[in-house]
Each structure stands twice: as C-alpha cells, then as structure tokens.
Swiss-Prot record:
Biological function: Odorant receptor.
Spans through the membrane: 26-46, 55-75, 100-120, 140-160, 197-217, 238-258, 272-292
Compartment(s) where it occurs, according to its Swiss-Prot or TrEMBL record: Cell membrane
Organism: Homo sapiens
Glycosylation sites recorded in the entry for this protein: N5
Membrane topology designation: Multi-pass membrane protein
SUPFAM superfamilies xref list: Family A G protein-coupled receptor-like
Protein name listed in UniProt: Olfactory receptor 5W2
Keyword Cell membrane attached: yes
MF-aspect GO terms: G protein-coupled receptor activity; odorant binding; olfactory receptor activity
Ranges facing Cytoplasmic side: 47-54, 121-139, 218-237, 293-310
Keyword Cell membrane part of the UniProt annotation: yes
One Pfam assignment: 7tm_4
C-alpha cells in the first residue's frame, strides 16, 4: 500500500441497523426499553450485592463483576446505536471509533474469561465446601479478577492497534451500528491477513481457554455430585450451577456463531443481528437469569424491598 497516497480519515459513518424510516421509530422504542432494563438490572445487581452482607461471597463477588462487564460493553455500543436510529448525522470520530471498540473489546473479553473463573469458583465450592472460603480467599479472588481484566485489556489493545493503523482511503461508511473489527477490515484498503490471523488466533485462544475451563470444572463437579448419596444433596449442589451454565451457553454460543462460522456464509446483515443480541439482549438476560433462579438473590431483594417500604 502506498501510504503517501493514503489519506487519513477524520471520522467514520455508521450505517446502523436499518435505513427503513418506518422501522426506525419502532426499533428505537424496542431497543431503548431493552437498554433501560439492561442498565437497571445490572446496576441493581451490583448495588444489591454491595449492600447485602449475605452476598459478600466469592460467587457474588464475581457475579457483580459480570454485571459490571455487561453494563460497560453494552453502554459502549447501545446509546450510540439508539441515537443513530433517529439522527441524520451518524458519524463517529476516528479516535472515538477506536475508543468505542477498545471499551467494548476489554469488557466482552473480560466477561468471556470471567465465566470460566466462575466455573472454577463453583468447582471449589462443591468439591470441598469446608475449605471453600480458604481456597477462594479475597486475595485469590482479586488475583483471578486482575488476570481477567489484564488479558481483556491486552487483547483489546492488540486488536485496536492493528486495526486502526490500517489504511482507510476509500469509503468511510461502516456497515454496522458500532465499530467492530470485521466491518472495519472489509472497509480497509490495506492487506488485512495479519489482522485476521491475530483475530482468529487470540480470540480462538480465549474461547478455547474459557470453554476448556468451564468443561473441566463441570466434569469435576459432576464427579463430585455423583458421590453425594441423597437426591436432595445432589439437587442442592447442582442448583447453584444452573444459572451459570445458562449464562455460559447463551454468551459463548452467540460468540462462536458470530466469529467462527465459515467465511462463505458471512453476512454483514446477519452479523448486525447477532451483534445486537450479544451487545444488548445477553447483558439484559444475565441478571434476570441469576435473580430469577437464585434463592440468595431473591432473599436479598425481599429484604431490600422491606427496608424501602418499611
């Protein structure tokens, strides 16, 4: 690429979800409601865990950070997408685009790894409940959490640096509602083979590590549960895992479909619909899954409700 003839763009133009004027108002109302529920539910989960002493355990410590990740990466994309549905000017500054991608990637990657850490936490709780608080001390929890965020930051910086040093000298229209890597690579006039290789390798490593961690943890959990003689004991042990497994299945399933399907079947329109699901819908579902299926969270909500009313 001749870099001297490659002019630097000052901004990008996000084409958004649809160009149909009749659908825009309806989609705005629907996604605004989804985002408000998402924001309120995740913020509420964080506040509830901080306020209720009974929820000051490793499991809920990690759950509060799962809600924090959901809140951050959905907020990185949601408000801009909502504004663009009604605004005439859908531009985003070049560095604003880079920042949006950076924040989104940090917290999406962190959530991916955090789900694996939460599986490890469930393994420690079930395999040896008497030593659970010792094995999962505050120091261990913070070390695991620090590792999660450091990997998320490192991965995001690698992809951002490689993507935003490419040459964008043609169209500045991104066929998406936020600055994601695949549509940016399609827009670039540079050779993107290195970017694609790094994206596949690094993201593949994170996905493989996460899925392997969850799989190994639950193999040990199942073996441990099988040693419990009473049906009630088995049910109690597994009941704490169902919410986590639901969250893993929804999040990982969406990501695998998004980034690991054959290039021959790749469609930007399909990509946008899938992105909408995991940037807005999945973050909304996580706190609902954990609150509706978790006895401790239900009890904490009842106590908070009684405090407010009385």
């Amino acid at each position: 690429m001749d870099w001297e003839n490659c002019s630097s763009l000052t901004d990008f133009f996000l084409l958004g979800i649809t160009n149909n004027p009749e659908m825009k108002v309806t989609l705005f109302a629907v996604f605004l409601a989804v985002y408000i529920i998402n924001f309120s539910a995740n913020l509420g989960m964080i506040v509830l865990i901080r306020m209720d002493y009974q929820l000051h355990t490793p499991m809920y410590f990690f759950l509060s950070h799962l809600s924090f990740c959901d809140l951050c990466y959905s907020t990185a994309t949601g408000p801009k997408m909502l504004v663009d549905l009604l605004a005439k000017n859908k531009s985003i500054p070049f560095y604003g685009c880079a920042l949006q991608f950076l924040v989104f990637c940090i917290f999406a990657d962190s959530e991916c790894l955090l789900l694996s850490v939460m599986a490890f936490d469930r393994y420690k709780a079930i395999i040896n409940p008497l030593l659970y608080t010792v094995n999962m001390s505050s120091r261990v929890c913070y070390l695991l959490l620090t590792g999660v965020y450091l990997v998320g930051i490192a991965d995001a910086l690698i992809h951002m640096t490689l993507a935003f040093r490419l040459c964008f000298c043609g169209s500045n229209e991104i066929n998406h509602f936020f600055c994601d890597i695949p549509p940016l690579l399609l827009l670039s006039r540079s050779d993107t083979q290195v970017n694609e290789l790094v994206l596949f390798t690094v993201f593949g490593f994170i996905e493989l590590s996460t899925i392997s961690g969850v799989f190994i943890s639950y193999c040990y959990i199942i073996l441990s549960v099988l040693e419990i003689h009473s049906a009630e004991g088995r049910f109690k042990a597994l009941s704490t895992c169902t919410s986590h497994l639901s969250a893993v299945a929804i999040f990982q399933g969406t990501l695998l479909f998004m980034y690991f399907r054959p290039s021959s079947s790749y469609s930007l329109d399909q990509d946008k619909m899938t992105s909408l699901f995991y940037t807005l819908v999945v973050p909304m579902l996580n706190p609902l899954i954990y609150s509706l299926r978790n006895k401790d969270v239900k009890e904490a909500l009842k106590k908070l409700k009684n405090k407010i009313l009385f």
